[in-house]
Amino acid sequence: MDERRTPSPCSSRPSSPRTPPCEMFGPVGIEAVLDQLRIKAMKTGFEFNIMVVGQSGLGKSTMVNTLFKSKVWQSPAPNLDVPMPQTLELHSVTHVIEEKGLKLKLTVTDTPGFGDQINNDKCWDPILSYINQQYEQYLQEELLITRQRHIPDTRVHCCVYFVPPTGHCLRPLDIEFLRRLCRTVNVVPVIARADSLTIEERDAFRSRIQQNLKNHCIDVYPQQCFDEDINDRLLNSKIREQIPFAVVGADREHIVNGRCVLGRKTKWGIIEVENMAHCEFLLLRDLLIRSHLQDLKDITHNVHYENYRVLRLNESHVLPRGPGWVNLAPASPGQLMAPGPEKVRKRSKDPRDDEC
């Protein structure tokens, strides 16, 4: 029986060939390319699309505002007269953030209603459908014969999953969600409201979560198979040891010892968001913005979107020609909610992979 093969995410990112260096007689100005890239980046800016998933009351909106130090997302005031939504609803908001002349077009997608129902069966389907709809929209734009010079990128580059601070282990809902979504999008789990746990409880909770992820073969970002060199391996190994980050969100400033800090004021003191002794928010911000933002976008395009594109092209046997463009057969709801490949092949065989 013929078995349909899914593309390998790792094989979608070809490694650079080992070409011997050429001896040069003098400088030719190659370093000026960096200036060209910088000037172009200053003109066009960047796009980054992030999704936050978690139950109500875990501080998702506050965390997004804290990450970008802007009022990106306004939390609606609690209203007891408004009934809880019976279905998961996705809401997106887009802002342009500018820092030192560089513009970032940020789109944040919230998922109110996730995990809030008595029966949460298949509550991940709307999220999975939304992610694949963005892939489908980008694919349809790519297939146009006369297409835009710059295709608008609405694909989700990162999904931050907020784990409730129960102090025990991952719930079945958490495991099922992570297992399905990790095949389709970059997922970064965090321990929400970590100030409700002691340092000992937090470390023990993290260890149990890491063991849960290993037992269920859930490969969250950054995946080991994407480490391209020794520097990536060293940096990402430290990150993998600390995931999920224990975070606290706050968008208000307080005066502590004569300095202004972001934090939450409590009866026993102020929890400083940017103090590693209080929480690991800095690690999350460094991962999402300062060190891995472009890598998140590259993996989205070269791995997750490429998997979706190849599967859609394989499933569409006929490509009917329209007036000036080529259109795939419409994606069915089942295709939009289908998870990605079960398992990815590694560049080099790792004996630890056999455990999964």
Swiss-Prot record:
Residues 44-315 form the Septin-type G domain. Residues 110-113 are annotated as: G3 motif. Residues 7-16 have a biased composition (Low complexity). One of its GO terms (biological process) is protein localization. GTP binds at residues 54-61, 87, 113, 193-201, 249, 264. Its main location: cytoplasm. Keywords: Cell cycle, Cell division, Cell projection, Cilium, Cytoplasm, Cytoskeleton, Differentiation, Flagellum, GTP-binding, Nucleotide-binding, Spermatogenesis. Residues 1-23, 330-356 are annotated as: Disordered. This is Septin-12.
